UniProtKB/Swiss-Prot annotation:
Residues covered by the CoA carboxyltransferase N-terminal domain: 28-289
Species annotation: Bacillus cereus (strain AH187)
Pfam family, one: Carboxyl_trans
Name by which UniProt lists this protein: Acetyl-coenzyme A carboxylase carboxyl transferase subunit beta
One GO cellular component, as annotated: acetyl-CoA carboxylase complex
Residues annotated for Zn(2+) binding in this entry: C32, C35, C51, C54
Zinc finger (C4-type): 32-54
Known catalytic reactions: N(6)-carboxybiotinyl-L-lysyl-[protein] + acetyl-CoA = N(6)-biotinyl-L-lysyl-[protein] + malonyl-CoA
Names of required cofactors: Zn(2+)
Cellular compartment(s): Cytoplasm
Length: 289
């Protein structure tokens, strides 16, 4: 009896059985990659996928983003049926595209269309990093260019939410050409007095950051978003210097004058509404033929 009182405590934790793990369905809980807090996924979704503990902005898919900024039921999609081919016959590219279509229920890495924010009509494009890491191929570039042209025709503002790893390597020079095509479309829109708001989310890199993402009349970003062209390691090896810890973050770019504002997701719709309201009937709304 007395001997039982002095038995050494076990120094290990019991690992739950496979059956116990199966009792918690997939998707019920989400772990924050920043603070490691585990929370109910429903709670996270209710908070616009912003961690309730540390404020980390989890990635949003295209439909979640549209729901968070547009008036309910106002969105009308453009060019839904456009799909990428494999013009360079890159190995396994078609299989990867098909896999992403099934996984995301999207045909490509961007969703474009029109909708309203507080009854103000806008054309909007939202990139979805779940599809080929949001990379820009021929179809992504074409859909964005068409959306800008639609904004030009309707004489309404164009808003884009970027989330991309850059140009799509499987399409080579055809992918790089989209940088010029989208930029030219935006120049035409701008010359006519059209308003363009670019919102950079995590991550916005490569050819996307070096083209249309940085051309906004207003360049906004979400907190903590990674924004840059080349990767940190490549830059450090090139300049042979250690870069600041916050290098290529939205906050770093704001401090160095490359962004107009870093906007919390809770405030994004209201911030866009205010910008649109300021330009209603103003100089930017005077269109030139």
């Amino acid at each position: 009896m007395l001997r039982d009182l002095f038995v050494k405590k076990k120094k290990y934790a019991a690992i739950p059985s496979e059956q116990v793990r199966k009792d918690v369905p997939d998707g019920v809980m989400t772990k924050c990659p920043k603070c490691k807090k585990i929370m109910y996924t429903k709670e996270l979704l209710k908070n616009l996928k912003v961690c309730v503990n540390c404020g980390y902005h989890h990635p949003m898919n295209a439909w979640e983003r549209l729901d968070s900024i547009l008036d309910e039921g106002s969105f009308r999609e453009y060019d839904k049926e456009m799909v990428s081919l494999n013009p360079l016959e890159f190995p396994d590219y078609e299989e990867k595209l098909e896999s992403d279509r099934k996984k995301t229920d999207l045909n490509e890495a961007v969703v474009t269309g029109e909708g309203t924010i507080d009854d103000m009509l806008v054309v909007v494009a939202v990139m979805d990093s779940r599809f080929r890491m949001g990379s820009m191929g021929s179809v992504v570039g074409e859909k964005i260019a068409r959306a800008v042209e639609k904004a030009y025709d309707l004489q309404v503002p164009f808003i884009i939410f970027t989330a991309s790893g850059g140009a799509r390597m499987q399409e080579g020079i055809l992918s790089l050409m989209q940088m010029a095509k989208t930029s030219v479309a935006l120049k035409k829109h701008s010359n006519a007095g059209g308003l363009f708001i670019s919102v950079m989310t995590h991550p916005t890199t490569g050819g996307v950051s070096a083209s249309f993402a940085s051309l906004g009349d207003y360049n906004l970003a979400e907190p903590g978003a990674l924004i840059g062209f080349a990767g940190r390691r490549v830059i450090e090896q090139t300049v042979r210097e250690k870069l600041p810890e916050d290098f290529q973050t939205a906050e770093f770019l704001l401090e160095h004058g490359q962004l107009d504002a870093v906007v919390h997701r809770d405030d994004m719709r209201e911030s866009l509404r205010k910008i649109l309201e300021v330009h209603q009937g103003g100089e930017m709304a005077v269109w030139q033929s």
